[in-house]
Amino acid sequence: MSSESSTGPEMSATTKQMLARVRQMVPPMLEKFHKGQLGRVAVIGGSEDYTGAPYFSAMASARLGADLSHVICTPNAAQVIKTYSPNLMVHPLMRSSPPALSSSDSGSSPSRTKSAPDTDPSQIAAQIIPMLDRLHVLVIGPGLGRDPLMQETCAKVITAAREKGIPMVLDADALLLVTKDPSLIKGYDNAVLTPNVVEFGRLTKALGVDEEVEKAEETAGETAKVEALAKALGGVMVVQKGAKDYLSDGKVTLTVDLKGGLKRSGGQGDTLTGSIATFLGWRRAYLEDLWDHGHKLNKEELIGLAVFGGSAITRECSRLAFAKKGRSLQASDLTDEVHTAFLNLFGEVDAKL
């Protein structure tokens, strides 16, 4: 199955043109840069039951080229994630709800119960929010789970990050927060949502556009669903994943038609969130004029280009990994293909010493 991996990716002329634009926001490798300028990303997620997802997201971000990649998770998850890679900075700042005490445990000593700082979402968030000033991008949701304390803490961090104008990629159970309270991100054009099919349906129902979305594809074409949801969210960028990826903020819609692999193993979406995060970090570097790029891209199009780049990288990783592994493909196989996917799609920007 390796013959296909040796050939280049198949794409339309439009996709090729879009990738050429994305490439303009990829920083060259320059001696003058210092650590942290080309992307400081943090993944908030990771719980006792889910340690792989935040790792895959953070590693995709790092492998693609972010300078610093953090994971903010629970202590139990941190112990595990630290064994996966020494390249990630892992912060055990999140807390899950304490187990409910039975009536026979009501007289338990304080040592058997969690202290107030471990059960108050405001106090937990207060340990995380000061980190935001040192970060460029947040990924929220991989491995988060539905624990109420974790969810409430994330809601407070999202609010603080929005106030600071930090770009955010929301996935998995972070989307449950949006479903319950769309105002968390509604109208925030630095937010990106990456729902799967089920999550997409929940979001449309929560926004009251489920019937509109149901009819949209029949009457207005295949991109109408994602456009309707993005408009309902007030301009938030939404990724509708599928045989093709459709990306829309309700005004501009992009289609990523690169061929991907055929295996749908869990965890591939984590490569997507991490890849988008790195491109969003590069967006900041582009806006800060860290290198001479000629200002050929408009600020308004950079979020879309970043998401396009992340989607393209993920689909190419999937194609390469499937060509090698076939039906045995796992999420970790995509992680191993990130650099090759980047070279296939963008080549390497010339280094200048």
Swiss-Prot record:
Protein task: Catalyzes the dehydration of the S-form of NAD(P)HX at the expense of ATP, which is converted to ADP. Together with NAD(P)HX epimerase, which catalyzes the epimerization of the S- and R-forms, the enzyme allows the repair of both epimers of NAD(P)HX, a damaged form of NAD(P)H that is a result of enzymatic or heat-dependent hydration.
Biological processes annotated in GO: metabolite repair; nicotinamide nucleotide metabolic process
Residues engaged in binding ATP: 241-245, 260-269
Domain YjeF C-terminal, chain residue ranges per copy: 18-345
GO cellular component: cytoplasm
Main location: cytoplasm
Name of the top EC class for this enzyme: lyase
Family: Belongs to the NnrD/CARKD family.
Keyword Cytoplasm: yes
Protein name: ATP-dependent (S)-NAD(P)H-hydrate dehydratase
Residue ranges crossing the lipid bilayer per the database entry: none
Residue ranges with Low complexity bias: 96-114
Region described as Disordered: 95-121
Organism per entry: Neurospora crassa (strain ATCC 24698 / 74-OR23-1A / CBS 708.71 / DSM 1257 / FGSC 987)
An MF annotation (GO) of this entry: ATP binding
Named cofactor requirement(s): Mg(2+)
Upper taxonomic lineage: Eukaryota, Fungi, Dikarya, Ascomycota, Pezizomycotina
Family annotation (NCBIfam families): yjeF_cterm
Protein residues bound to (6S)-NADPHX: 143, 196-202, 270
Xref: PANTHER family: ATP-DEPENDENT (S)-NAD(P)H-HYDRATE DEHYDRATASE, ATP-DEPENDENT (S)-NAD(P)H-HYDRATE DEHYDRATASE FAMILY MEMBER
